[in-house]
Amino acid sequence: MAEAKFCLSCGTARGSSAAEEDGGTKTRLRCAACGWTHWNNPTPVLAAVIELVDRDGQVLLARNAAWPGKFFGLITGFMEAGETPEDGIRREVAEETSLSVDSLSLIGVYEFLRMNQVIIAYHAAARGEIRLSPELVDYRLFAPEKVRCWPAGTGRAMADWLRSRGVEPQWMELPPGKRAIEVDTE
């Protein structure tokens, strides 16, 4: 998402400036006219490793319509205002796959610096008929030991979940200069 070029409070052109904060001097986007600061804090993103309890524990990976290549990844989404992370990931799983979540457990919290996000990843034991939302174009079911993890963002959550199941993760190799979503995971 592009940065706003003008102050969101008064409309003056923004620029970077240094100011004393807790911990010392910090340079941020600040408005010289009104002092408003653009904090640029990371966005929390929810992710689910979906284990299908009614399909022998297979893992569901899906392909987003906006992604290049044929990458299949975890179900992810943003929290809504007033929603807990657990409620948010249950909603995202239902919205994007039509699956019902039986239980959730936290896998971990992961940085995704390139996107300025913090990923809160859950294991979701789920069941039901899979019907994808329009933002997803395909899905694949994998036995846990057949999943190839990607070396970024949610791929580390998948690897941690596999290890918790006694499965040593297998990692995909990315060509130089390629992001995980630009490669074929089929």
What does each of the following model-derived ranges do?
Residues 1-48:
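Acidic, metal-coordinating catalytic segment for phosphate/diphosphate chemistry
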Residues 17-18, 99-108:
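A short coil-to-beta-strand element that immediately follows conserved catalytic motifs
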Residues 25, 68, 113-117:
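Short acidic/glycine-enriched loop/turn segments that link adjacent beta-strands
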Residues 43, 83, 134:
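Short beta-to-alpha loop/turn elements within the nucleotide-binding domains of ABC transporters
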Residues 52-95:
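Conserved Nudix-box catalytic region and its N-terminal flanking loop in Nudix hydrolases
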Residues 110-138, 144, 161-162:
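Active-site-adjacent beta-strand/loop module that shapes the phosphate/pyrophosphate-binding cleft
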Residues 128, 141-186:
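Long C-terminal interaction/binding lobes of large macromolecular proteins
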